[in-house]
């Protein structure tokens, strides 16, 4: 039986529906460790009309930890918005680290740019204003085997995640990680039907149901679906 939108709160972009527990995690563990420029960017973005697209602070710390454990140096980011996850990545990379960041809307990126500059990490970022698929196709033609990427983070148009995956699994090195954000989509992916969603939300929900099934069966990667934020699926390339 499908769940109703009335049964589960979609107010917060977080799989954790206990507001008290989420507040505890953020205030006890996440905010005290949040870089001052990330805090500033978060506070500005929270006032934006599309603030629900903001990566939560606890997820940001998770991404930072993963990048450091991997000793990642070359990364790709598809979907930037105001740049919270991008700044998180730039802060986690070594001084000579490089990020290829792709988004169709540079004006959102420019909201976060002053915070990136104040953090002293702008030199690590190559921002490309474009649809992602043509850029990825060009990168596939130009990237040599020894220059493959360590890590990719995708938080963009949901219906294209599977298309991005086919490119990224070739651009990221064996042993590298590809992360897909929002793969639990407010928890709605658990149900064959979820009445009451806006049509665009429903398209995304169905895309994630298909993607989750596809990734679970893809022999090229091993996966872990992490219930942080709105769900993050980590794919480690095997071959």
Swiss-Prot record:
Sequence positions that bind S-adenosyl-L-methionine: 55, 77, 79-80, 85, 103, 132, 157
InterPro entries in UniProt: Cation-dep_OMT, SAM-dependent_MTases_sf, SAM_O-MeTrfase
Keyword S-adenosyl-L-methionine: yes
Molecular function GO labels: metal ion binding; O-methyltransferase activity; S-adenosylmethionine-dependent methyltransferase activity
Keywords: Alkaloid metabolism, Metal-binding, Methyltransferase, S-adenosyl-L-methionine, Transferase
One Pfam family per UniProt: Methyltransf_3
Family the entry assigns: Belongs to the class I-like SAM-binding methyltransferase superfamily. Cation-dependent O-methyltransferase family.
Entry protein name: Norbelladine 4'-O-methyltransferase 2
Organism: Narcissus aff. pseudonarcissus MK-2014 (Daffodil)
Lineage: Eukaryota, Viridiplantae, Streptophyta, Embryophyta, Tracheophyta
Encoding gene (name): N4OMT2
């Amino acid at each position: 039986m499908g769940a109703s939108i009335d049964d589960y709160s979609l107010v917060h972009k977080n799989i954790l529906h206990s507001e008290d527990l989420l507040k505890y995690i953020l205030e006890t563990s996440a905010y005290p460790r949040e870089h001052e420029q990330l805090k500033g960017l978060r506070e500005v973005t929270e006032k934006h009309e599309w603030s629900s697209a903001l990566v939560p602070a606890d997820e940001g710390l998770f991404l930072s930890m993963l990048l450091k454990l991997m000793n990642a140096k070359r990364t790709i980011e598809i979907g930037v918005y105001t740049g919270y996850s991008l700044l998180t990545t730039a802060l986690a990379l070594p001084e000579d680290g490089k990020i290829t960041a792709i988004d169709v809307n540079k004006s959102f990126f420019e909201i976060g740019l002053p915070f990136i500059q104040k953090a002293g990490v702008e030199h690590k970022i190559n921002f490309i204003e474009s649809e992602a698929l043509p850029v990825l196709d060009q990168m596939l033609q130009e990237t040599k085997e020894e220059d493959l990427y360590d890590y990719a983070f995708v938080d963009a148009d949901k219906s294209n995640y599977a298309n991005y995956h086919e490119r990224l699994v070739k651009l990221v090195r064996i042993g590298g990680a590809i992360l897909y954000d929002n793969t639990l989509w407010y928890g709605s992916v658990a149900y064959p039907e979820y009445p009451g969603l806006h049509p665009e939300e429903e398209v995304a929900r169905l895309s994630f149901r298909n993607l989750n099934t596809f990734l679970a069966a893809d022999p090229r990667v091993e996966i872990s679906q992490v219930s942080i934020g709105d769900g993050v699926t980590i794919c480690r390339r095997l071959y």
